[in-house]
UniProtKB/Swiss-Prot annotation:
Residues that hold Zn(2+) according to the record: 26, 29, 42, 45
Gene giving rise to this polypeptide: rpsZ
Identification of the protein by name: Small ribosomal subunit protein uS14
Function, in words: Binds 16S rRNA, required for the assembly of 30S particles and may also be responsible for determining the conformation of the 16S rRNA at the A site.
Gene Ontology terms, MF aspect: rRNA binding; structural constituent of ribosome; zinc ion binding
Keyword Metal-binding belongs to the record: yes
Upper lineage: Bacteria, Bacillati, Cyanobacteriota, Cyanophyceae, Gloeobacterales
Cofactor(s) listed in the protein's UniProt record: Zn(2+)
Subunit annotation: Part of the 30S ribosomal subunit. Contacts proteins S3 and S10.
Organism (species): Gloeobacter violaceus (strain ATCC 29082 / PCC 7421)
Family to which this protein belongs: Belongs to the universal ribosomal protein uS14 family. Zinc-binding uS14 subfamily.
């Protein structure tokens, strides 16, 4: 995620940093799509970590 920080600093210097220009990315793999905001993960990493029991309070839905 070093590249993301470099890009952010570059935008700050140019005065072009705004919330709409920043794209949410998964903190684990950097994937920009399928982002789950509450966890900061993409759907794939969220699923893997939930199956491994690494996300406290997350249970598989059953109805």
């Amino acid at each position: 995620m070093v590249e993301r920080e470099k890009k952010r600093q570059k935008l700050v210097l140019k005065g072009k940093l705004s919330d709409t220009r920043l794209h949410n990315r998964c903190w684990r793999c950097g994937r920009p799509r399928g982002y789950i905001r509450d966890f900061g993960l993409c759907r794939i990493c969220f699923r893997e970590m939930a199956h491994q029991g690494l996300l406290p309070g997350v249970v598989k839905a059953s109805w």
